[in-house]
C-alpha cells in the first residue's frame, strides 16, 4: 500500500481534467469517444491523448483510461484500434469490464496495468484473487460492500484496491441493472444508463422509491485507508 491512498478524480473532458489536476488529484480517469461507461460525456480524442497524458505526467498525476463496456465481435477491430492508441499514449492503466478484452490486453500489451472496473461487481475475496491470477493490478470494489468485507479483500490480495467515496448508488447491484435497457433501450453496460431509477416511482405512498441517497464517505477516508484501500474514487 502507498503511504497515502491516491485521490482518483473523473475527467469527462478537458475542463474537468484541468480542474481535477489543479485541485490536487493524484490520478484521473477518462474515456475516449467510444467503449467507455460514460458515453454522454465530452470524453477525449485518441489523437490528442498523448498530449493530455504528457500534461498530467508533467504534474505528477497518473492517467487511467476506461475501456469498460461490453464489446461485440463486430466492434472488436475498432476497440483494438482504440487500445493501440491508449497503449501508445503511455497511460498508467486501463479499466475493463469484459474478461475477454482483459485477456487480449494481457497478450497484446503485457506491461500495461489492468484495472477491474466497478462493472465487474467484485464483491468477495475469491473474485479478487481470480483477477489477480489474470494479471490485474488494481480493482474497483463493489459499492455494496461493508467495511469488514473491504478489509478482508484488501488483506487477501496484492492488487491495489479502489473504493468509491462519493457519487450515486445503484438501486440494483452495480453493473447488473437492466432497468434502463428495459425501459429505454439504453444499456448501462454500454455506457448509456438513463438512470430511470431517479424517476418518481411510488410504493405505499412513498415517492422516488427506487432512487437511493448518494454515497459520501469523505468523513471515513482515514478509516478506509487503515483498512488497506489504496485509491479513493470520485464518481464521474
Q: What are the roles of these predicted feature ranges?
A:
Residues 2-122, 140-144, 149-231:
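Active-site pocket-lining/capping segments in soluble small-molecule metabolic enzymes
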Residues 125-126:
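Conserved nucleotide-cofactor-binding alpha/beta core module
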